[in-house]
Design a protein with these regions (language model features):
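Anionic group-transfer/hydrolysis microenvironments
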Residues: 2, 53, 93
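Mobile active-site "lid"/loop adjacent to the S-adenosyl-L-methionine
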Residues: 5, 26, 30, 46-77
């Protein structure tokens, strides 16, 4: 939702000669995902990176966002936009985060956190969590 981050992304794409190949959307992520996942013929993605903030109470959002309380809905809606072979990577830096695998049991979830924490932080691995998520085969 931030113009600053959207501008950074556009500049990065331009610098990497990928300008014009991607869409940039400024929206409340929860609203956009709900809208897209409710459409029968919405666009499908081979790869989705989902790295939400731990907490947000942006003026542009209807309600405050809390990753612990909203991650199931967020992951479900994003996963519904995957192609059959698509992969969703979900990550968070919330140190006390607990993934609710029980309510996501229809998805294949692999914890890849150890592979994504830099060696500099190996002594404190709970600074970051990451999962690879796919639809059941």
């Amino acid at each position: 939702m931030s113009n600053t981050y959207l501008t950074w992304a556009k500049n990065n794409m331009r610098l990497n000669v990928a300008e014009g190949l991607h869409d940039f959307i400024q929206a409340d992520c929860l609203e956009w995902l709900a809208q897209q996942s409710s459409q029968t013929y919405s666009k499908r993605f081979d790869l989705i990176f989902l790295d939400p903030p731990t907490f947000s109470n942006s003026k542009r959002m209807q309600d405050a966002f809390d990753v612990q309380n909203h991650h199931v809905e967020l992951i479900r809606q994003a996963a519904s936009l995957l192609t059959e072979q698509g992969v969703l990577y979900f990550s968070t830096n919330f140190r006390r985060f607990k993934l609710d695998e029980q309510h996501l049991s229809d998805l294949t979830i692999t914890d890849i956190s150890k592979k994504t924490v830099p060696l500099d932080f190996a002594r404190t691995p709970k600074i970051h969590y990451c999962w690879r998520i796919t639809k059941h085969a």
